[in-house]
């Protein structure tokens, strides 16, 4: 194993139709420079990341930022880290994080009946 997922930083809840940002922190735990990438899904739907892959120095931690639009249900994000062995991407680590759907409460207006007067 070369690419250790340190954490998934994402909100614990989000309203439907909002963009959810997912930051996956990955550390190169090998003694050599490594090409590292991250893939992830929410439930079974994949989502994009800012970088395809990065060259990471030994001991260095990098953040891969991904995003998706929150569906109308709770989701589980699963992320995988991968390192390049010279000819193939090798899966190194996996981590999950649950994100709950938040129901937005309609805001009550400050409008008052007394604001009207008869003409």
Question: Residue ranges of each PLM-predicted region?
Answer:
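Short acidic/proline- and small/hydrophobic-mixed sequence motifs that coincide with surface turns
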Residues: 31-36
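Asparagine-centered strand-capping/turn motif at beta-strand->loop junctions
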Residues: 26-30
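Solvent-exposed serine/threonine-rich low-complexity stretches and specific carbohydrate-binding patches
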Residues: 46-59, 98
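Short, hydrophobic beta-strand segments
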Residues: 64-73
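Enriched for extracellular/lumenal, surface-exposed ectodomains of secreted and cell-surface proteins
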Residues: 77-97
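Structural beta-strand segments of beta-rich domains
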Residues: 18-22
């Amino acid at each position: 194993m070369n690419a250790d997922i340190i954490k998934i930083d994402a909100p614990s809840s989000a309203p439907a139709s909002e963009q959810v940002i997912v930051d996956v922190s990955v550390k190169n735990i090998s003694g050599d420079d490594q090409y590292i990438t991250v893939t992830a899904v929410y439930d079974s739907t994949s989502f994009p990341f800012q970088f395809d892959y990065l060259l990471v120095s030994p001991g260095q931690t990098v953040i891969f930022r991904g995003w998706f639009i929150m569906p109308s249900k709770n989701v589980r994000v699963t992320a995988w880290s991968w390192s390049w062995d010279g000819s193939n991407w090798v899966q190194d680590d996996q981590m999950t994080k649950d994100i709950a759907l938040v129901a937005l409460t309609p805001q009550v207006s400050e409008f008052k009946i007394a604001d009207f007067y008869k003409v």
